[in-house]
UniProtKB/Swiss-Prot annotation:
InterPro entries: Exonuc_VII_S, Exonuc_VII_ssu_sf. Keywords: Cytoplasm, Exonuclease, Hydrolase, Nuclease. It comes from Vesicomyosocius okutanii subsp. Calyptogena okutanii (strain HA). It holds the Pfam family Exonuc_VII_S. The keyword Transferase does not apply. It is an enzyme of class 3 (hydrolase). This is Exodeoxyribonuclease 7 small subunit. The keyword Cytoplasm applies. Bidirectionally degrades single-stranded DNA into large acid-insoluble oligonucleotides, which are then degraded further into small acid-soluble oligonucleotides. GO terms for molecular function: exodeoxyribonuclease VII activity. GO terms for biological process: DNA catabolic process. Belongs to the XseB family. Its EC number is 3.1.11.6.
Length: 74
């Protein structure tokens, strides 16, 4: 069973990957590995955001929240 994804840690890890890749000090192989990990983290972060958006929508529907505005996508 895999660990539960931590969104905040995912963002921190993405920032570290970006800094490492922008430094220009990585070999081609390391750059590809970092890029691959970054893509996976991006997918996990997006999935976590989608789940949060769905939960917010569900909760506001249950409470008949009438002032709901759609969330903006980045």
């Amino acid at each position: 069973m895999s660990e539960k994804f931590n969104f905040n840690q995912g963002l921190i890890d993405l920032e570290k990957i970006v800094k490492a890749m922008e430094s220009g000090d990585l070999s081609l192989e390391d750059s590809l590995n970092h890029f691959s990990k970054g893509v996976e983290l991006t997918k996990q972060c997006q999935s976590a955001l989608n789940k949060a958006e769905q939960k917010i929508s569900m909760l506001t529907e249950q409470d008949n929240y009438t002032n709901e505005k759609p969330l903006k996508r980045l």
